[in-house]
Amino acid sequence: MTLLQVFGTGPAASASPNLSSSDPAAIAATLAPLGIGFERWQVQGCLAPDADPAAILANYASEIARVQAGGSYPTVDAIRLTPNHPDRQALRQKFLAEHTHSEDEVRFFVEGRGLFCLHIGDTVLQLLCEAGD
């Protein structure tokens, strides 16, 4: 289940979220004023166990082209991190380490999930994305 939780920071902040929602429209409306887009795409069936990045990108070529046309996203890549991936541990550590990007990025989950923790001003947003996000 996709989930957005918004927390305040500082000494007076509560341990409970100020907002908790799994409604895609509410998530998009909360993120939009922060310059963060959120949408859902139709997941196109299950991936073959041996699907490579090129096959994944080909399945979503029209959606990718639409997003690229609407912003500055010159590069596209895909990663599939399965339990038997040869670099699974190193890649997992890379994704677990808090880091920033100097450019805008678009993420889409065909399968699996990922948690993004965004520190914006005096707010922390936790966005759990799953297949289709």
Segments the model singles out, each with a brief description of its role:
Residues 1-6, 12-26, 30-32:
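Non-catalytic accessory regions outside enzyme or core folds
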Residues 19, 28-131:
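Active-site region of the double-stranded beta-helix
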